[in-house]
């Protein structure tokens, strides 16, 4: 039996061996159960390689055409989920090459000329990750669009800003949504930077030292949409920085979403009551009929652990390897795939859910009023009256203690009561102590004043355009 028609268990590299691979080792070392996900990228790289080999005279035009036709048929099998994957053939590369040779005969055996699985997998993963980054950046932008719309809708809605989860100063709900937007904007920028760095083509590096065939790496890189070939053949097959960098970026995305999720969970609770999530994004309890649980937000918060786990897996995987390809690197696919899926799905969930929430404006305003949120405004007022800030801070602290004992807000104290703490306080102080006056006073760039929120939202729209 020729190797082209190899029975399951007879790999395409058996010429040097005198006994068959142990059945357990075949199962243990096979990766096709997960790297089959790279099939379309593998075919794309093979098509470019075949065209380049023909252009350089390594393949005849007839061989090139047969290979391209065979690969097109295999692509259709993959897309239609009819491809006969075999774990005995180890990985996505050997499965596709074996299938190609079955279909077109001798020409299929020539496709691997001037190429190794080492540069092949490095190319496949870069192609895959480039597409994944484009998809994730699009979901980030979609979520950002939703946040901008929500910010504009709630530009005048006053809520408490917190430090240490204690009421600090009044802000607007729209301002808070634009803070989320900025977190995602940094994420989009980081992914664009990651994409730029990974967009170099390793194909042609072969096993580690390059190839003696007269290949044209620039042509292959151009056809595959890369900016240029990689510069060093040894580094080309050794490098997994781009995968680690992506997982770091994905981890940051999930950290940001997790922080948002924590706030959403708090805000939906009866103790806060700031927002209501649509029923379609919540679940109930098997025992408590009154429950409406923010499960989507909680799951996103939990999935941050998965993304961080993927990053640690890859860092640990690479830390002790000598240069060039080592079989350890087979283990890079699953954490990378999981990081891609986790980031994409979490963003999709939030891009759908968050813009659809409803805000309880009365509860938000009442919470801001209840926590002496305008105390800093009173201190600023006293500074404008000539007090040093530290003295003003002391005065307001005593006034807050007095109001707390009286179970009243600062704005509910009389002028006479306020003046017992400082004679610099005049009757114009009450405009300062209102929630609306507090947020309106912060009308500088980046401030929480409603007109600034609208201006920031418009600028955000323009950046997304």
UniProtKB/Swiss-Prot annotation:
Pfam families: ASL_C2, Lyase_1
Enzyme Commission code: 4.3.2.1
Name of the coding gene: argH
UniProt subcellular location: Cytoplasm
Catalytic activity: 2-(N(omega)-L-arginino)succinate = fumarate + L-arginine
Name of the molecule in the record: Argininosuccinate lyase
Biological source species: Halorhodospira halophila (strain DSM 244 / SL1) (Ectothiorhodospira halophila (strain DSM 244 / SL1))
Pathway where it operates: Amino-acid biosynthesis; L-arginine biosynthesis; L-arginine from L-ornithine and carbamoyl phosphate: step 3/3
GO molecular function: argininosuccinate lyase activity
HAMAP family the record matches: Arg_succ_lyase
Uppermost EC category: lyase
Residues spanning the signal sequence: none
Annotated family: Belongs to the lyase 1 family. Argininosuccinate lyase subfamily.
GO biological process, one term: arginine biosynthetic process via ornithine
Major subcellular site: cytoplasm
GO cellular component: cytosol
InterPro entries: Arg_succ_lyase_C, Argininosuccinate_lyase, Fumarase/histidase_N, Fumarate_lyase_CS, Fumarate_lyase_fam, Fumarate_lyase_N, L-Aspartase-like
Record's keyword terms, sorted: Amino-acid biosynthesis, Arginine biosynthesis, Cytoplasm, Lyase
């Amino acid at each position: 039996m020729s190797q082209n028609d190899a029975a399951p268990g007879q790999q395409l590299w058996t010429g040097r061996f005198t006994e068959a691979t142990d059945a357990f080792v075949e199962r243990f070392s096979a990766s096709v159960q997960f790297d089959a996900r790279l099939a379309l990228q593998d075919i794309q790289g093979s098509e470019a390689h075949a065209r380049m080999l023909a252009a350089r005279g390594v393949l005849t035009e007839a061989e090139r055409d047969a290979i391209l036709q065979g690969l097109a048929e295999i692509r259709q099998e993959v897309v239609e989920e009819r491809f006969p994957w075999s774990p005995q053939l180890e990985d996505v590369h050997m499965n596709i090459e074996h299938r190609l040779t079955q279909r077109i005969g001798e020409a299929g055996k020539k496709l691997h000329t001037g190429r190794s699985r080492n540069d092949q997998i490095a190319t496949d993963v870069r192609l895959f990750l480039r597409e994944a980054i484009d998809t994730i950046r699009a979901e980030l932008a979609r979520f950002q669009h939703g946040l901008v719309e929500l910010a504009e809708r709630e530009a005048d809605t006053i809520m408490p800003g917190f430090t240490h989860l204690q009421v600090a100063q009044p802000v607007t709900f729209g301002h808070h949504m634009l803070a989320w937007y900025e977190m995602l904007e940094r994420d989009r920028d980081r992914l664009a930077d990651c994409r730029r760095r990974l967009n170099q083509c390793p194909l042609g590096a072969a096993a580690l030292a390059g190839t003696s065939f007269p290949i044209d790496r620039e042509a292959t890189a151009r056809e595959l949409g890369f900016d240029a070939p990689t510069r060093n053949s040894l580094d080309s097959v050794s490098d997994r920085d781009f995968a680690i960098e992506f997982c770091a970026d994905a981890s940051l995305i999930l950290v940001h979403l997790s922080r948002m999720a924590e706030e959403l969970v708090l805000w939906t609770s009866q103790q806060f009551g700031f927002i209501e999530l649509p029923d379609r994004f919540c679940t109930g309890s098997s025992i408590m009929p009154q429950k409406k649980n923010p499960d989507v937000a909680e799951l996103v918060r939990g999935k941050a652990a998965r993304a961080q786990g993927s990053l640690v897996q890859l860092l640990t995987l690479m830390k002790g390897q000598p240069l060039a390809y080592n079989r350890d690197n087979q283990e890079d696919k699953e954490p990378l795939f999981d990081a891609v899926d986790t980031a994409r799905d979490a963003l999709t969930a939030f891009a759908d859910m968050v813009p659809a929430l409803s805000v309880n404006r009365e509860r938000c305003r009442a919470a801001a009023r209840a926590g002496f949120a305008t105390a800093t405004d009173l201190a600023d007022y006293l500074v404008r009256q000539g007090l040093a800030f530290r003295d003003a801070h002391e005065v307001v602290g005593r006034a807050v203690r007095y109001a707390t004992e009286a179970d009243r807000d600062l704005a509910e104290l009389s002028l006479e009561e306020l003046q017992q703490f400082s004679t610099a306080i005049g009757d114009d102080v009450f405009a300062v102590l209102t929630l609306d006056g507090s947020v309106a006073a912060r009308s500088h760039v980046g401030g929480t004043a409603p007109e600034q929120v609208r201006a920031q939202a418009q600028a955000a729209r323009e950046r997304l355009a």
